[in-house]
Amino acid sequence: GKIATGDLFVGDSATKAAIEAKCAPDCVEMEGAAVSQIAAKNGVPCVILRAMSDNADEDGHEVLVVKKFSIGEYVATATKIVAAMVEAL
């Protein structure tokens, strides 16, 4: 899917709506494009794997702080995803 990237945390509905109107992304994030750009500039292969942690709205900061999750479940899911990516290569 399409990912928008930028240099600020999207923490309100107005900013979210503006981004959606501009490029209709499936999600937004802050670091992936920068990492990919530097890797490409230096000839280093790069894959970005992200976990979405909030809804990019007024409750975004709260979700990051109060959401409980099982680290075991996270690791198991991430392992399956990465293994499938490696097999596809």
Residue ranges and their predicted role:
Residues 1-89:
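Glycine-rich phosphate- or other oxyanion-binding loops that anchor nucleotides, phosphorylated ligands
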